[in-house]
A protein has these predicted regions:
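A short N-terminal beta-strand-loop micro-motif at the entrance of redox/enzyme domains
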Residues: 1-3
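Glycine/small-residue-rich phosphate/adenosyl-binding loop
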Residues: 6, 10-83
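Small-aliphatic-rich amphipathic alpha-helix that forms the alpha element of a beta-alpha
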Residues: 8-9, 54, 71-115
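Short, hinge-like loop/turn segments at secondary-structure boundaries
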Residues: 41, 119-122
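Structural motif
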Residues: 51-53, 101, 123-125
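Short secondary-structure boundary segments
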Residues: 58, 106, 132
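C-terminal helix-cap and adjacent tail motif
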Residues: 66, 126-152
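Short proline/glycine-enriched turn/loop segments at secondary-structure junctions
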Residues: 114-120, 137-140
Length: 152
């Protein structure tokens, strides 16, 4: 888990604000208890047997001036952007280590905050399962570069 988090924290962040936070559940008992309280049944099944990482970031810092004024219209969106960069590093490192991941955005925020004592000044992102996949799903078809790129 530490190797994954080390890789995650190498990602860039707005003005080097480093607001990403991780909460890892690694013992089978903690994972089972957390899953039952905080994840819908389909995510409980999809992540069975995996460690879980809850992602969050400190709000009102990434994308904000020191006096708390948003730098632009995106505001806390920059915190989510930074969190995504960090999470991608975590996921890529997991893959390098032969581990699989599942990003779960459908979760019970209130239950997660309570279970992990996450402070109100942090906004939650995803719950990421880390382990070994039970199935090999088909990769969805990707759009072509022409569909997503406009050159000027």
């Amino acid at each position: 888990m530490e190797a994954l988090i080390r890789a995650a924290q190498e990602a860039p962040s707005w003005k080097n604000s480093q607001t990403t936070r991780y909460y890892a559940l690694v013992t089978p008992e903690k994972v089972e208890e957390f899953s039952a309280k905080c994840l819908p049944e389909f995510n409980q099944k999809s992540s069975k047997g995996a460690a879980l990482v809850v992602t969050a970031f400190v709000k009102d810092r990434s994308g904000f001036t020191q006096d708390g004024t948003p730098d632009n219209e995106v505001g806390n969106g920059w915190g989510y952007y930074d969190l995504g960069l960090h999470d991608e590093n975590l996921i890529l490192r997991a893959r390098e280590l032969g581990l699989d991941t599942l990003i779960m955005g459908i979760r019970d925020e209130k239950a997660i905050r309570e279970a992990l004592s996450i402070p109100e000044n942090e906004l939650l992102g995803a719950v990421i399962a880390v382990g070994y996949r039970a199935i090999n799903p088909d990769k969805p078809k990707r759009k072509t570069v022409d569909d997503i790129l406009k050159l000027f």
